Amino acid sequence: MTGPLSTRVATLCNQIVAEVGPDAAGQVERIGERLGEPLRVAIAGRLKAGKSTLVNALIGRRVAPTAVGECTRVVTRFRYGPADRVDVVRRDGSRRSLPLDDQGMIPQRLGVHLSRVAYVDVTLTSEKLRELTVVDTPGLASTDAGVSARAEAAVGASPVPAGTAPFDADIDADSASEVAAAEAVVYVFTQAVRADDVRALEAFRHTSARLASSPINALGVLAKADTLVGGADDPWPVAGPLAQQQGTLLARTVSDVVPVIGLLAETGEAGRLTSADADALKQLAATGNLQVLLASVDLFRGAPGPVGADRRERLLSLLDLYGIGFAIAQLSAEPRLGTGELVRRLVLASGFPRLQHTLEQTFRWRSDAIKAGWALARLDRLAGHTQDPRTREALRDAVEQLLREPDYHRLRLLDVAQRVATGAVALPADWEQELTRLATSEDARWILRLPDAGPAELADAALRAAHRWRAYAVAGAGPAQSRVAQVAHRGFYLLSQRVRG
């Protein structure tokens, strides 16, 4: 789905193709085409952090292998297509097509030496990929220097001295170009955030010219939340507060930290739990030794009971102990509960819906402005490089005319919000929070913290905020703060006009 800002820029591209020279026309067309592509989300994190499991949940199919293999050592792009297809894209641009394996997953062996692989391009018929392209990156801080190099390249990291970052210093530019187009970044970690986790996130932010690498469009995921406690115990009393602590620690790097039980999310979203699995869980629910059965993985495997060893092993692979305990509790309370409803509750218990909401509502809304700003910057850059005066003037006139439209003030708001969010410009905490709300939402009630206000009250509140920012720009700010405040002033003034109608 293309938003109104990027749609307008795409229309502009179509209009000016006929006004520019032939050399520039192809580039303008490509910029316009890129605006129509789905939101790109790059998934990054340590090896075995749960990235591929999360990718499968986002896609709605178990297609990304979770065991370490060749395909987990390269950048993999998942996008929508009319047929399932796997292409290994070499650095020279050539492709080698592969079928999915017997389990419907990417083959573990790619048939191309890893040093020659730029990325793996996977097209799937999954409906979830119609509006979302997922880019899975290799594990960061790998003990394998080659894998770490590809991970560094995937996040666009600059070379750094050995031992000072979680990457090898070698950079794969082909892989870097794949992730550079992402509108959002999801960084996956487990339990405590380590110093090099923070440095890895900083690599996204400092080496990209795109707003996607700022806290505005970066999200942390505390994966494997069920492993924070033992056995089948409820992890959420621990996972929730821990995610809040991590969010505070990473406030300059990510917009939020969301705890997720990735295995439950993958099992539910990919439709892996069958009626036979549900029947086995019902049999277990009817036994009298649940406390022993769920005390540990070994006891679950070996304790006497009506369900065979193979089925128990499968349940562990689908749900692990917490998921099994949760499912049994649901079935004990409602023995006639259907498989579909059980799956729905498992997904809710995974915490995945909150992550989906953030990606779909927050990142997707922001990505409209991100894409529009990227396209306008590319058009302006093209104007600066062309040798044809007619082309140069046509491009610059079109960009300047569009930027004068009030709707495009959002681009400037996102730009200054990024500077403040990364600490480049310091603002008082409450001012920073207000600016972030203004830059990242269209909901006037949420921006102004007036959930029950009508249009007139909202308009007056927005105007007061505009005056407050104007006064701060004139009297209470340094030069950098003043520039930010001027942008915020105009943003609130435009908001007051919009809500007043």
Question: How would you label these PLM feature ranges?
Answer:
Residues 1-22:
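Charged, amphipathic alpha-helical linker segments immediately N-terminal to NTP-binding catalytic cores
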Residues 8, 12-15, 27, 358, ...:
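Charge-rich, solvent-exposed alpha-helical interaction surfaces
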Residues 16, 335, 362, 366, ...:
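Secondary-structure edge/capping motif, primarily at the C-terminal ends of alpha-helices
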Residues 32, 36-294, 349:
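Globular "head" domains of long coiled-coil molecular machines
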Residues 50, 326-334, 437, 461-468:
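Active-site-adjacent bridging/hinge elements
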Residues 213-215, 219, 225-233, 237-411:
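C-terminal end of P-loop GTPase domains and the immediately downstream helical coupling element
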Residues 409-501:
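N-terminal J-domain/J-like co-chaperone modules of DnaJ/Hsp40 proteins
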